Amino acid sequence: MIERIWSGESPLWRLLLPLSWLYGLVSGLIRLCYKLGLKRAWRAPVPVVVVGNLTAGGNGKTPVVIWLVEQLQQRGVRVGVVSRGYGGKAESYPLLLSDDTTTAQAGDEPVLIYQRTGAPVAVSPVRSDAVKAILTQHPDMQIIVTDDGLQHYRLARDVEVVVIDGVRRFGNGWWLPAGPMRERAGRLKTVDTVIVNGGVPRSGEIPMHLAPGQAVNLRTGTRCDIAKLTHVVAMAGIGHPPRFFATLKMCGVNPEKCVPLADHQSLTHSDVCALLNSGQTLVMTEKDAVKCRAFAEDNWWYLPVDARFAGHEPEQLLAKLISLASGE
């Protein structure tokens, strides 16, 4: 229902307009206060890169963060990652992730980023505290990437990168809750880089797509061609589950059942087992896998995806970040 409202297909969005106006007024005033200096942002002693969204829901932001971190690491840059830690609840903040940190403590995305990149990752509702935690433990850090946080103006940033779903784009264009917007589309004029996931990019936007890899078994780490799996039940607890289901079909998999879950939904062994009948194979997103690996069964698999770019624009972005990290 919410997708139909945000896309404008349902007229119910009009009933939510008063709340959207209030949301837009409050968020606009907050940004204006920081812009005019009425509120002061904390500036880190190293460059900060924000990778965020203008809309709620899945846009492909986390794969972009992972790509960015890996590319910087390959070029010898010491990079850390901070996040709000949505869906997690730590005993205390800031929380610096370790191999023992769970998604219940830190949230899905931070654990996924930590496991994929090995970079120092810290979470806190106050992102500046997360940055300080990383710099205390890793004083030689050269640059910080913040996963989400475009609207977290308490943390000063040197580069802003926005990721857009190229198919859904901005829906009906209204602020939450009548539409999907955290900020209006005009905000794009003030950011450094706009990356478009799928669809047709517009002038000045960098095209990107998510490329699936081989299926990975949660228990053994064994890899295989996803199309070889049979009697598949697909599960996705991400911002936009239909994208994952469409990816499976593109890979030649026709699931017997598709189960969309809420983003950041907690899962137990019994919850997941209840989705399957005897002889069926479960395929989930990598983001779900970080929650399920501890209690996985032999027939549970996940499909990793990686951000892929074409053209010279990504190299220009990386060159800019390397220059900042080097203090040039």
Curated annotation (Swiss-Prot):
InterPro entries: LpxK, P-loop_NTPase. One of its GO terms (molecular function) is tetraacyldisaccharide 4'-kinase activity. Keywords: ATP-binding, Kinase, Lipid A biosynthesis, Lipid biosynthesis, Lipid metabolism, Nucleotide-binding, Transferase. It catalyses: a lipid A disaccharide + ATP = a lipid IVA + ADP + H(+). One of its GO terms (cellular component) is plasma membrane. Pathway: Glycolipid biosynthesis; lipid IV(A) biosynthesis; lipid IV(A) from (3R)-3-hydroxytetradecanoyl-[acyl-carrier-protein] and UDP-N-acetyl-alpha-D-glucosamine: step 6/6. One of its GO terms (biological process) is lipid A biosynthetic process. ATP binds at residues 55-62. Transfers the gamma-phosphate of ATP to the 4'-position of a tetraacyldisaccharide 1-phosphate intermediate (termed DS-1-P) to form tetraacyldisaccharide 1,4'-bis-phosphate (lipid IVA). HAMAP family: LpxK. This is Tetraacyldisaccharide 4'-kinase.
